[in-house]
Amino acid sequence: MIFAKGHGTQNDFVLLPDVAARLSLTAAQVAALCDRRRGLGADGILRVTTADAAVAAGVLHRLPDGVSPGDWYMDYRNADGSTAQMCGNGVRVFAHYLRASGLETRDEFVVGSLAGPRPVTVHHADQTHADVTVDMGKANKLGPGEAVVGGRRLSGVAVDVGNPHLACLDPGLTPEQLAALDVGAPVSFDHAQFPEGVNVEVLTAPAAGVVCMRVHERGVGETRSCGTGTVAAAVAALASAGQETGTLTVRIPGGDVTVNITDATSLLRGPSVLVASGEISEEWWRDQRR
């Protein structure tokens, strides 16, 4: 079984090319493969397939709204084996892999997800590096919320970016204090407000067009980056300045991305790196199915 390994601003993924969607992916297998000691190690798995194949194989019960049968489909699984609606960094890496592998030759195409279609523009791609913009769709503010992160109680704004986020901006937080915060520790939030869990971002106030962010992703813990989280952070940061639209650089531990919030949509531009490819032992893979 072949695989590729890549990352978008150090949010890393194992890609499993499975265009016909024939591969069985149990939660136990996903968790084992993502384990950094007994598997390959990753924040998540990206199955590379098409929307119609995913429906035919029962991976999807039906096409997500706006996704066409012939679209590529990113079947994204969190490191704990759960299924996730969307991952902005994952879409960039997914699109890069399609180009680098020769499965796709266009500069502009659509990647389907549980959250709907995500049009991509590949500005540059070679076998290792790519620069990709993802149309993330409209990010919707849902109201205020609170979280406790690293023992610090924070107020935030709930944002729907195809998956749930709570972006917590602390105007008194410096980049140095943010770097020292224990974002990897379990976070507390209102489960009545977020019954399926939530991704929690902690961010500084914007300065000179830059906002610094760290994220605790549901089902994963702290990651070096979160694409949908950077969009949520940009929405919250702009709102703190009394703006509904604008462009910000979001600085995460894994690097910088550019987020453009418009009246109609949100655009995420950033890098992708393909690190390795190889084969997974079929015997090992079978042993992980439980």
From Swiss-Prot:
GO cellular component terms listed in the entry, alphabetical order: cytosol
Annotated GO MF terms: diaminopimelate epimerase activity
Predominant localisation class: cytoplasm
Top enzyme class: isomerase
Reactions it catalyzes: (2S,6S)-2,6-diaminopimelate = meso-2,6-diaminopimelate
Active site, renumbered: 87 (proton donor), 226 (proton acceptor)
Site (Could be important to modulate the pK values of the two catalytic cysteine residues): 165, 217
Biological pathway: Amino-acid biosynthesis; L-lysine biosynthesis via DAP pathway; DL-2,6-diaminopimelate from LL-2,6-diaminopimelate: step 1/1
Cellular localization per UniProt: Cytoplasm
Complex and partners: Homodimer.
Protein name (Swiss-Prot/TrEMBL): Diaminopimelate epimerase
Gene source species: Mycobacterium marinum (strain ATCC BAA-535 / M)
Taxonomic classification: Bacteria, Bacillati, Actinomycetota, Actinomycetes, Mycobacteriales
Gene: dapF
